[in-house]
Amino acid sequence: MKNNGKFYMADNIDGTVRKDSDGNITDTYSVNIKGDDINNTSFYMLNDIRNANVTFDNTTINAVNNQTHVYNFNTLTVNSDTNFVADVDLANAQMDRITATNYGTHQGNLNVVGMNLLSDSTKDVTEIYFAQPGLKNNVVNGMPKTGEYNLPSTAQTTFYTPIYKYNAIYDNRDDGGYFMFAKGDKILTPSGGGGITVTPTGNPSDAYNPAILSSSVASQAGANATMNQTFNYSFQNSDNFMSIPYLERVAIKTSNRYALSPTGDATDVGTFSQLFNAQNETSSTWVKPYASFENIPLKNGPKVSNITYGTLVGFDTPIKSIRHGWDRTWTGYIGYNGASQRYSGVDSTQNGGLVGGTLTLYKGNLFNATTVSTGAIVGDNRTMYGTDNYTMLMAGVGNKTGYNFEFKEGKIIIQPSMLLSYTFVNTFDYTNAAGVRIKNDPLHAIQIVPGVKFIVNTKNGWQPYIGVNMIWNLLDESKVSANDVRLPEMSIKPYVQYGVGVQKRFKDRYMAFGQAMIQNGGRNGISLTAGFRWAIGKDGKPLEKVQRVNNKVSSVTPRAEVKVANNSTVQPERKIIKQLTPEQRVRLGARLQDSTRTTSLGSLRQI
């Protein structure tokens, strides 16, 4: 055979044979199987070559036909290195093998470079007889020790069924050559004389074909990671608002809503209160793209190279005062999310969308935000068997609580926080490209994230910060079955997250922000996000501030003249106070912080 030649022997070969009176063969025919390239010529031996003198020489003998068979020759001689590919039935401890009545003088080795596994083993270690004493010293398996044999790069080093992965070694014993098989989570070492040492790898997922693990990996590194990213980024209102010093937040919340009413004391201007004026309320919109690049060494699973990416677009209602000193705002958001994973020859991709809402509460330096979101994902896995397609539904709820400790009038803020979240992921059952039925129990995951942020407010509006978080995942084991075989329950190990970010405000209506966080531990890599926020709507008519003058002080207080429609009238009981500027509101807030919201006439005169 030459020039990538292939020969298919679909029928038996039975030549002329002479025998003596005792039935022994005295003369027979010869079959010489020879190629010009061991890796690029193939002889498909799908039937018997009976009673022949056979030689193998510089080619590949392929006996794969999904059934095991014992080939028997009169004589066999390996003239030069020859590859051999065989069917293996682990359940019955049988494989394709070659026997002969006699063996010639071998000048090469029979390299077993590939195996087609027909069934799974029922034992921890399965041994199968392969070579007779006349051949056993010239057999080399496809996974030698490094540098021991010069095997072609295409030699198969691990062996697969649709569910399991196997390691195999060749054990050359006195009575013949044996192949030893064990699942991939065990390393076999022959100790001679039929003895063998079994060493566990420590990772139960090593026992399985990577193609069968793709559903568990997609649930953890795809959907679960996507929901956790959403929880990190959906608290945009509190992230932006609570980076601002307290006095500036007071000025924002009480913008155009001051009123004064005297108490009757000439030295006391009166009680400070807020008036609702819908025309002066503004909403805001924000957009936040994100991406992460990482590897995830899953507990009880493979090490996964993972990329997540997406964009959230949100809308915040105005901050409104409610009861007992609390303020609140609502946020609605939608998002696109995607992820891709790569591990052990498997490529997975997920794409989907989500929708959610957040309620954020503020009181002084305290904030509490709760978000609820739900979405769907369609995904595909590209494996050695083909492409799997599946659909996932996900939902979750998260709550983040934090408090600001301010120093130097808000120039420095230390903000400890706690994020708690619950994630639900359901992957619908499907049949993969190998014909295995994949059944998925819903994933229930709880995440606990204590963290702290150190924020600096500069004079020019820049707000750089440093953040540190510790992430624990609880009850997040994925539960998946393949043809009723329970697969390892995988989860993401705890990890630490730290990094830097910055915000910048422009003209009181715009804000830009960016962040880079490094992750170490159960996730290793970097998460990046950036975005832009802008206020929408326009200011209404400025609100006038009215003070009623009581009789006690009317004799010393000049009456104010008010012109309306070009007419002059005198209002003996009222006077008009101009709207306060933003700078005046901040200065006034400094005197009102944590007070009963009363002030003196002297304070107002200073303003």
Language model regions located:
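Extracellular beta-strand/loop-rich repeat segments of large surface/secreted proteins
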Residues: 2-137
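Flexible, glycine-rich linker and terminal segments associated
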Residues: 180-181, 185-188, 192-196, 475-478, ...
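Extracellular/periplasm-exposed beta-strand and loop segments of Gram-negative cell-envelope proteins
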Residues: 304, 339-349, 372, 377-395, ...
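Outer membrane beta-barrel translocator domains of Type V secretion systems
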Residues: 212-409, 515-517, 522, 591, ...
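Residues on the lipid-exposed face of transmembrane beta-strands in outer-membrane beta-barrel proteins
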Residues: 311-317, 355-361, 372-374, 397-405, ...
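Outer-envelope beta-barrel architecture signal
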Residues: 281-285, 324-330, 364-370, 408-416, ...
